[in-house]
Amino acid sequence: PAWLVDCPCVGDDINRLLTRGEK
């Protein structure tokens, strides 16, 4: 999500979780 890019420190962590969930 774009709102995650706002906070890389947390976005990277959440992005990883979302990526695992989507795949």
From Swiss-Prot:
Major toxin that belongs to the bicyclic heptapeptides called phallotoxins. Although structurally related to amatoxins, phallotoxins have a different mode of action, which is the stabilization of F-actin. Phallotoxins are poisonous when administered parenterally, but not orally because of poor absorption. Signal peptide: none annotated. The keyword Hydrolase does not apply. Disulfide bonds: none annotated. GO terms for molecular function: toxin activity. This is Phallacidin proprotein 1. Keywords: Thioether bond, Toxin.
